[in-house]
Amino acid sequence: MPIGKLRRSKAISFRGPASPSLKFKSFETLQGKPLGEMGQNGHKQEEDMAAQRPHFPAEAGAEQEMKCHVAETPAQNSQVPSTTMENGFYSFANISDNTTNKNTNRYSYLSDNTACQLLAPATGTDYYKSLTPTMKPITERQNHAGTTMSLDTIPTAENISFQITLPTVPPSVISSRSSLINRQRSLSMRYSSPSSMSSLGSTPTKLTTLKRSNAIRCKGGLLQFFSQYAVKTGKKLVKWKIALRKRLFKFQRRSTKNKKNSSPTTSHLKRVNGYVSNVRRSFSTQSRLALVPEIVRRTPSRRHLTANTGMKDATPASPSRTSIRRTPSSIKRAASTLSSNYVYRDGSDTSSQAPELKSTGSSLAPAPSQMVRSTALTSLNSIVRQPSIVVNNKVIPLSRFPGEKMQLPIREEDEEEEEPSTKTDDYVIDTSKRMSTIGEIQASRISSSSGSISSHSSSIQSSHFDDASNSCPLNDSIESDSDIECTRTAWNHFLRTVIAERIRMRLQLAKLQELALLKDDSLDILYAVLRKTLDEPADKSSSTYDPDIMPENNSETGLGNGFRSSDQLSRLKEGSRKRNTSSSTMLALPEALATVRRSITMPVGLNYI
């Protein structure tokens, strides 16, 4: 068995005693086991086999110079591994990774018997490559040092049966080699370009180098640093950009938040209703007065409205405004309302007249229609907003009454008198009878229920303004114009009398106050007048004209509403002395009048203290 080929058996386990084949021989393991003759003389057989190897004469000179030195004693053998490790030629096994460059790194002599590559570079001497490792046994024989190859053991420092060495280099050769390397390095640094100074192409300067991958020697540190720095800088720039954009937009929103939008906003309801709230109302003054009760609006000389006055009152609508709906039925209703006949019959005309053309002076006018129409308003939106009724899909507006005696009554027929053909009609317009106006109904109510001025004032209630169809029978007698005028005259006389009494009382108080400033004795007369005047409305006026208001003078002294204690009388005397004679008479009234509450019967237009 050749010495260079050392084998070891396959280890089943490396956990201690489980693998007895992989066990190193030592003094402890061999202490109690005596060696036989074959085991002690096993190295002799190895010497004989090594002597039979072929010996080349060309290597004789080099072999004498590069002779392996073997220690003679065990003490010297312990120093051999240290010297060989310093030279860098000791290698136990060929262990390397797949990235090791085989050209620049050496391998162990155990893997090859023919040649051994040294640490010197390719530029060194050539005779180093031809050297072959030699293994010479130790001549000294010891009982505990002999081993055999049959045991498949691996030699260690303690088990020194033979020494594994490599040819050593003399110090003279090493010094010459180092000087040669330094000379070449200086020349290359002087005459070479900077690109050739890369670490990848440089030769190793040390005798021993670690086995490492070529990727470790790559100059990638700075490249990785700058690439990471670029990525981080880009992220920071993006964050700064977003922050600046947010700040800018917040500033713009803050500046525009306080600004008011000058353009008017149109809501959905305004758009549907045809911009009603933005357009001037087309109701005229006459149409507003038509809703006022007849008792206040009526004048002695009344004239019937004509078509010309109605057209003047109406204001033309804007051409750009649209209607609410554009269905065929709404268009027909609007057309029938706008194109009605505005020439109405007088009160003396009867409904039995033939509907033919009649001569009115020198001009001919068509017979009036039996339908009641209001004065035409060109705005369809205004027509829809007016109070009206619908009969058989016909719109009858009720906002304006051109003539009092031209109103057609609307009555509901009894179920017994209805015909089968007219059962679908809710209302029937009777053209043979005239519908009384609101003014006539109010006047008749006032004249029939009141016998005096007080009864007239108490009879005006909200119940008298009900619908005419519910509160007025059809066969009710119609009052004449003279009765209405008489009622209005009596009401006006009552109001004038009350106002005149109040004014006269204040004038008398003012005159008495001026006299009281000159003489203190006249204050008694003033107090008597005040008691008399202040007690009268509480006893008469409030009970007669204001039944809902309770009297407020419940004082036990009997001095009226304003005088309830002697302190107030003393204050009144002192204040009357301090007042100036040039002051206004209305402002110079005593302070007691300020506490008197105004009665409802007193006119609203006067200013009270």
UniProtKB/Swiss-Prot annotation:
The record's GO CC annotations read:
cellular bud neck
Q: What is this protein called?
A: Altered inheritance of mitochondria protein 44
Which top-rank group of organisms is this from?
A: Eukaryota
Annotated source species: Eremothecium gossypii (strain ATCC 10895 / CBS 109.51 / FGSC 9923 / NRRL Y-1056)
| Principal location listed in the UniProt entry | other
Q: Where is the composition biased (Polar residues)?
A: 349-363, 552-569
Which residue intervals are annotated with compositional bias (Low complexity) in the record?
Answer: 315-330
* Subcellular location as annotated: Bud neck
**What family, per the record?**
Belongs to the AIM44 family.
Instruction: Quote the gene name from the UniProt entry.
Output: AIM44
Supply the source organism's classification.
Answer: Eukaryota, Fungi, Dikarya, Ascomycota, Saccharomycotina
Q: Where is this region: Disordered?
A: 300-330, 342-370, 537-584
